[in-house]
Amino acid sequence: RWDGRGLLGEQIQGFGLGVMNARAAWFAKQDPRFADFLTEGRSFGPHGRGLVIANSVAHYDDALSRELTELVETANLRIRDLGFKPYVAPAVSSGAMQLLLTLRGDWHCGSVCLGDVWFGVRNRYTPHGLETESLSLPDALFARLAETETLLREIL
């Protein structure tokens, strides 16, 4: 029953991180140095500035992860420089795929309300509500995520 007070933060999710995750997977398939991303990698944070791509949560390499993040961040700009505006790939990877995974209750990439910051993480909806992936993270990766959190708080 509608209470007139709007939606709770837990009822809203952004799906822009899906296309960034898909781009990271594409680069991982092209370059063997990034191959661990396909099984152990993660995408965190916003769709743009502050994005963090981790080559692996088990065998994190900060320099490699920063290189992969840069490739992912600039991929869209390179496509636009060619005269194209990418619509289909983001619609599929951020929209359709992530939405289907959400509706199935499967793990997917999405920005969710964590406290007072919207942060892109791997998550899923269960009968008990939103579940975000909880991992032990290497210190260097945790530090990057803390930097992104600070950046996002400054936007508010």
What is each PLM-predicted segment?
Residues 1-35:
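Glycine-/Pro-rich loop/turn segments that contact NAD(P) or position catalytic residues
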Residues 26-156:
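Long, compositionally biased stretches enriched for glycine and/or charged residues
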